[in-house]
């Protein structure tokens, strides 16, 4: 809570090489926050940018001390950067936004209004995504459907990481301390009073995406994490497939016996054997792969490495870097 007893909103931006966007982002966020009676802080988490992004932030900090900067020691990715921002936020509520201005700052007032109505988590749902190609939208829609089918919680379709989270809900999320958290799923998992706000997502303001849909591994990892974080269904798939293959094998065996005994079918042992071997081999590899994903998550957790390492901080009461 700020010293003037106003409620405080913490806005968190993770970024990588966004020199073409940051100034416009700051201008629009400041304008939006001037329309509400709240104090605020702007936490920019720098994922080891190599362009002029940091210089732009430092220049803006000279006139606006609400701007705070966290510099990572190397590139850790979006999720660790957001977690770092969450842990450093002092606001009564936090909002994480993409730094590319695809999430328009102008709808912050709508999120705040829902928060004022008593909601602890305010999701944003994209009704339209400008600048996105049909293939990406189609694959994304299918991925959401699959995750929804196997997940133990309801993850809203077309809802990303852009959402408002109250201090109460945020503390619950941070207590989980998962090694590879799915940030768009955890707010739904912790519960509390939740709602959603619809908006049209803009095209990127400038520059190119740092997460190309086809060449980047991030979308695939997010999809796998979306399934494994809130569901054990994949572990049972091998059981169900094993049953189906066994049942199918029995039916096929009976079919072969009938064909040979009553219709004089020629010897097909080798072809039948090869089909059975290939099918069972594929199922075994599939089952091992699924279990490997879960074991890999356990292995990663047992390493007990920090999720991120901070090189330096500016604007915080405690500017030491031992928090990770």
Please give the residue ranges for each predicted region.
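Structured catalytic core of nucleotide-sugar glycosyltransferases
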Residues: 1-133
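Hydrophobic helical membrane-anchoring modules
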Residues: 2-6, 185-324
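A ubiquitous structural signal for well-ordered alpha-helices
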Residues: 25, 32, 56, 111, ...
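Conserved amphipathic alpha-helical interaction elements at protein-protein interfaces in regulatory
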Residues: 31, 35, 59, 63, ...
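Acceptor/aglycone-binding surface of glycosyltransferases and processive sugar-polymer synthases
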Residues: 66, 70-74, 78-88, 102-181, ...
